[in-house]
Structures are given as structure tokens and as C-alpha cells.
Amino acid sequence: MSNLTPREIVSELDKYIVGQNAAKRMVAVAMRNRWRRQQLDPALRDEIAPKNIIMMGPTGVGKTEIARRLAKLSASPFIKVEATKFTEVGYVGRDVESMVRDLMEIGIALVRAEENEKVRVKAEARAEERLLDLLLPGGAPQPAPAQGMGGLTFDLSASHSGGQAIPQPPAQADASQASPPTGTGSAPDSRSSTREKLRTLWHGGKLDDREVDMEVEESGGPQVGVLSMPGLEDVGSQVRDMFSKVFPSRRKRRRMKVRDAFNLLTQEEADRLIDHDRVSDLARERVEQTGIIFIDEIDKIASGSTQKSSDVSREGVQRDLLPIVEGSVVNTKYGMVRTDHILFIAAGAFHFSKPSDLIPELQGRFPLRAELSALGKDDFLRILTEPHNALTRQYTALLQTEGVHIEFTGDALREIAAFAEETNAQTENIGARRLYTILEKILADLSFEAPDRSGDRVTVDSDYVREHLADVRANKDLSRYIL
């Protein structure tokens, strides 16, 4: 677990998110408290539960991004779900426990990737030896293709290797021109020499683009269409997993490049080296101790919401959420997962409701509240320039791939920021996402013509911005559809 201090966490979040300091400080303290809890005695550690957070603010101000960056910073399993996708038990829709099962799948993928990286060098070494076994010609004299080991056929002619023929041992020479070696050690020595020559060619990249036929395991397995009704996806997944264990895995022959064959062999060897039971145990522990579940649109299931629905009980969804948030045990295919120490971050705009419209029991499970402010012109200007992944840097890098170099002037950025604020005020306020639509409109022609303008340098100034937004500014109704 990361032992960054709250100040360091906020500093890292500042690299990608502008403003919203109160929310950043709150999640930084929540993350630091997890580290503090791990330093305690086990008896006291189990008594300390995370303080769940509700973020309030309009769309596009950074609620989801704060939680996502926090999870990435701490290498924690993270999942974003929407409260409106869940329904009360007995209705058609996903049950709330599915979010924990999905989080466990993410945890498994996260830990498996880490374990793969640990054994990568050893797996690649083993895969290389298997690849050489496949490439090394057999003992039977055949013109071409030659039959390799492991059920792989390989054309050894020079026409597929860029003009360079793969060396073959004397055992494969034409019987009419060469006699079998009489010495007992000559054949193994020749085979070893050929193997090393193949290794040299492989390391030099001379074999990457050659094609081979290789038997691989079918990843899909038998397609069992069972219980595919809405709301029963989890049950159907478990039944399919059961059938996949009953039916033997099928293999099929595929033609692929040697580089792709090496990658498949590396993955096979990594799977053999990894202890999958240990992966499940580590993933379950990480999910239980450091998992983060981000519940978006929590305001849509509050009783004060003006959106009515006759077939879904919003209060029922809240009551189903209670045991998960408070701490319960959820059955997954990797074992039982406790939710006592998973951090829940709920978020919503709360335009037509307020946190107090949630049922009191659920309010009590989210003791911390952070209000995110709407973005203005100055915030938009900072978003365009300060973050490491600023939109201007993204568009500049994208067009550079076509050989077009663009430069945004300061007055152009101020013009874009002012127009974003104006459009958000006159239409729907979508926060920083407005910058995407404006920049796409400004650079639409340039992006289309970029392949024909390689080597050009384009300066985007305020006049350029006003020219490309003139039609939208002149027609306010048009701006509602385009921006």
C-alpha cells in the first residue's frame, strides 16, 4: 500500500485535476487513514472502518477523475458503477452485490498482471527454448515445408526469411549427396550448433515476420447460452464457468507470426509459473483492504428526485446498498469477500435532491461530504494548460503523428475558456467536458486535412478560434446541437 502523505497525494492529484482542493484533501486523508490502519495491532485494526464519502457537484467538475486517480495512485482495485443500474431484489436489473463481484474480477486482473511481471524474465526464457524446439528441423529429410517439433509446420525456405535461409543440420541434407555421419557425437553437435544459429537469428529479429502454424487453445470454449435474462448475468456467468471446467479445452491450429507465437508461449509459461490460488488470495485481500467502489448518480435514487418510475423502488435500492456499505460477505467465484473495509465514494449532482433525501441509515454510512464547485473561465484556462494530460497537449501530439505542428497562443486559450463558460451558462452546464466539444469544432477542418498538410505549422490564435466558432456563436439554437 502507498505510504504517501496527504500533502503528497494532493500534489499528485494536482497534476491531473484543477481546483477542488476540499475534495482532494478529503480523499487524501481517507487514503492515508488506510495506511495508518495497517500499522495498528490486528485487534484494533479490525475495529476501524473507512469513512465513506459523498461528493456533490455538477457534472464535469472532476468527481470521477479524483476517485480514479486516487485508485491508480494507490494501485487499488477500483470500479465505477451507476446507482441507477441497480434495482431492488425481485425486480429485473442487477443486484447490488454484483459490484463487489466485478471489483473482485478487477482485483484478480491487477494481481495477475503483477505476478506475470515478476515471472516475465523466466517465462520468456522458457518460451524461447520452446520456440527453438519448434523451429529446429526434425530428423526426417524433407524438402519444404519441414516438420518441426510440437505439431508445428515451418517453411525453412529462404523466400520467407528476407533472403536468408535458416541453417539446417547435415542430417537433413539429401541422402544421395551426403552419407549419415559415422561419429556418435556429430549429430548432436550439429543440432546444437543449428539451435544456437536459430537463437542468434531470433535475437536479431530475423524471424519475427515469418509465419508458422501452431496449435493453440480456444479461449472461448463451448458457448452455453443459459440464463441470459437481464439481471441474471452473474448466475449465467457462474454456470458458464462450471461448464468450462466440465468440457475439455479444445485446441485448434492457427497461422501466426513467430513473434506472436513467442508471446503466446510466454503467456503459457507464465501461467504455469504463477500460483493461481495465491493470486486469488492476494486479490481477495487487496479488494477487502484497499478496494474502492465509486457509486455515481447516487442522487437519482434519492426520494427527492423528480424522476418517477413505476417499476423500480429507489428506496429499495438504498436498503439493498446498506449491508454492502456497512460491511457484509459477498459470495464470488473466487471465494467469500468481506466489504467491511472497502472505501465507498458516492457522487451526484443533487440538482433536484439533497443528501438528506437519502434514507437516514444510508446517510449515516457516508459521514464525509465534499462539495465540488462549478468551473469558471479561469478554471477552464488552467485545465487547458496545467495538467500533464492537458487537452492542448493531446491534440498537439495527435496531429504531430501526421507531421502537422500546431501551437496554441495565450489569447486563443483565453478565448476558448471564455466561450466554454458562456456556453455552459446559456445551455446545459457540462463542466470541463465542454472543452472537448469546442476544441473538436475548432480543429475539425485541420484534423480532416492533416494527412495532406504534413510539414505545416499552424498557429491557433484568437482570430482562428473566432473564425471557426463564428457560425455557432451567431446561431444560439445551433450551439445547443453542436456544442
From Swiss-Prot:
Residues 192-209 have a biased composition (Basic and acidic residues). Residues 136-212 are annotated as: Disordered. GO terms for biological process: protein unfolding; proteolysis involved in protein catabolic process. Residues 136-147, 171-181 have a biased composition (Low complexity). Keywords: ATP-binding, Chaperone, Cytoplasm, Nucleotide-binding, Stress response. Gene3D superfamilies: 1.10.8.60, P-loop containing nucleotide triphosphate hydrolases. A double ring-shaped homohexamer of HslV is capped on each side by a ring-shaped HslU homohexamer. The assembly of the HslU/HslV complex is dependent on binding of ATP. ATPase subunit of a proteasome-like degradation complex; this subunit has chaperone activity. The binding of ATP and its subsequent hydrolysis by HslU are essential for unfolding of protein substrates subsequently hydrolyzed by HslV. HslU recognizes the N-terminal part of its protein substrates and unfolds these before they are guided to HslV for hydrolysis. Belongs to the ClpX chaperone family. HslU subfamily. This is ATP-dependent protease ATPase subunit HslU. It comes from Nitratidesulfovibrio vulgaris (strain DSM 19637 / Miyazaki F).
